Structures are given as C-alpha cells and as structure tokens.
Amino acid sequence: MEYSTLIARLKTASVSFENLEVQLADPDIANDPKKLESIARERSKLEPLVIDFNKLLDTDKEIEDSKNLLKENRNDKEMESLINEELIILEEFKNELIQKTTIALLPKDPRDERSVMLEIRAGAGGSEACIWAGDLARMYERYGQKVGWSVKSVSASESDMGGFKELVISVKGDSVYSQLKFEAGVHRVQRVPATESQGRVHTSTATVAVMPEADPVEVKIDPTDLEIGTARSGGAGGQNVNKVETAIDLLHKPTGIRVFCTQERSQLQNRERAMEILRAKLYEIQLKEANAKERSQRLSQVGTGDRSEKIRTYNFKDNRTTDHRLGSNFSLEPILAGQLDEVINACIAQEQKRMLEDFANEIN
C-alpha cells in the first residue's frame, strides 16, 4: 500500500474515533445502555489503531527533524554519525508501525468475535480413529481452559471400544472463532495403538468442523421442516435418565442433518442445545455457499479448510506435529496438552500475509 494511502485511511479511522468519543459524551446516548455499549465497543476497537497512528505521525516528525539536524552538522563527523544511528532506529520503528497499522486496517471477518460449535468426527481407522477423536477433544478442552473459554460437550456418540464416533463441543468466549477457525480440516495421527501387539504404526484420521454460532435471526428454521423424537438419555441426570426420555433426536428434513443431544438434564435443555447445533450447521452451509467463489480463489494459497482437507499430522514415534499449510513442525506433547498458541499464531500470520498481498494487488 502506498504510504499516502495508508495515512489517508488512518486519518479516516482517527476521525471516526473522535466522533465516537463525542457520541459517548452525549446525554441521550448515555441513557440508552445498548447503544452506549455498542459505541463503547467500537471505540475500544479503534483506540489501539489511533494510538499507533499518532506514534507514526510523531516518528515522521522526529525523522524530519533529524534530517534537518543532519544538514546543519555536515562538518561535524561525530554528530553526523550519532544522527545517522538515530535515523536508522527511527526508520525501523516507522516500518514496524506501518506493518502494524496496515494489518489493523485489513478487512475483518465479522464472525471472528463469535463463540463456536466444534464438531469432531472419527474418520478412517476404525476404533483407533474414535480414540483419536477423543484425544483431539481433550486437546481443545485444555486449550480452551488455558485461554479462559467455557468448553462443554453438548452432543456425543461414544464408541464401544473407547473414544467417540462423533462429538460436538460448545466453546464460548471472546473471539473464539478467530482462533479456532484454523483447526477446521482433517487431523491425521500416526502411532502404535494400545491393542497392536506387533508394534506396527497405524494411521487414523478425525475431521474437525468449526462452526460459528448463529443467531435465530440469521438462520430461519421452519418448524414444519423438523422431525423431533425423544429417547432415554445416557448423559447427565442421575437415575432420572433411566425413567424419563430426556434425549432429543432432531432431524432437519430439507438437509437431512440429524442432531442427537443427550448431555443436558432435561428434555427442554437438550432441545435448546439441539436447535443451537442445528443453527450452527445450517449457518455453516450458508457461509460455504456464499463464499464458494472466494475459497476457490484462495485454494492454492492457504487452503479451503474443508473437512476433506488434511491440515495436520501428529507423529507419536518422532514426537512431531506437522502443519501442512505452514510447512512447519512442532513438538507433539505440548500441542496435545493444549498449547496451540504457536501454531495458531503462525496460521494467523500466514493469513495476514496473504491478505496484505491481495490488498497490494488491488491497489496496483
């Protein structure tokens, strides 16, 4: 991006910030809690950018002053050397601010701030794939606990041999989707199963779908499109589950999506959870259809994130996790312990780099 274009956009952001501050001081807005909260949130988002913009302007002024001082001291070699050293430091700081503010101005995914439904399905590999699905669920649970999110299983289909054929996890918190969206895809594991007597390494897979939660307003569901059944639950509820049908079996007839929810204590709670999962699934379908063209253009760059795409391999023998999108290796044990910051931050950086390249191409 041309520097003049960057400055113009930053000035626009600064003006918007000032307008928001004026609105916050308006007594009429102060008497409207919802509007006040919305404006305060927007102001909070812009504040770091405006602070960096002011730093950039100050740095430009310091560079200009240093260059003028350099002209005045051309005959003083010692002073000239000191000024040149200062200019190098200032130019480096300016470049850092340019990079930081340019990234901050990139288009934001409006879904990034949402909580998510995380769906994990056992793939190829039989019972070992089911066990692997459970391992992934624990990995995300540990990561969620580490960053302060609320993580709860809302639907699960257990395997007779251990693990899960399928499970859905609700992850609630600030900007959950912005972090976990990079986990969508096929996760492959290479290890010796506990039941393997010959010590042979088996390869199994599990697919992860990351679905941003949808509001009822965004996804309209016709009640006539639903087929709802009940069953005795094997989930929470103590002895009550043996006597009362608390589980919900929900079928969305137009799409064939079926949701079986057992984890809550009452039929009403399970029904609400099932509807929440269904909305997230339908919202995901809407997003896929709406973004099909964009994803096809991005395929060769960062991948689609579809469930059919292998994104990561976990090799137990070599204690190595390979992220195929990044072309990078990470230590296996910390990853499985929920220490995902390094790999997620690398994915974010890769995405930002692609967006910067796209942005530069649009400008040119």
From Swiss-Prot:
PTM characteristics: Methylated by PrmC. Methylation increases the termination efficiency of RF1.
Gene3D superfamilies reported in the protein's UniProt record: 3.30.160.20, 3.30.70.1660, 6.10.140.1950
GO molecular function, a single term: translation release factor activity, codon specific
Chief localisation class: cytoplasm
Keyword RNA-binding: no
Cellular localisation: Cytoplasm
Modification sites for N5-methylglutamine: Q239
Bridged cysteine pairs (disulfide): none
GO CC terms: cytoplasm
Sorted UniProt keywords: Cytoplasm, Methylation, Protein biosynthesis
Pfam family, one: RF-1
NCBIfam families: prfA, PRK00591.1
Similarity annotation: Belongs to the prokaryotic/mitochondrial release factor family.
Function: Peptide chain release factor 1 directs the termination of translation in response to the peptide chain termination codons UAG and UAA.
PANTHER family registered for this protein in UniProt: LD18447P, PEPTIDE CHAIN RELEASE FACTOR APG3, CHLOROPLASTIC
Name of the molecule in the record: Peptide chain release factor 1
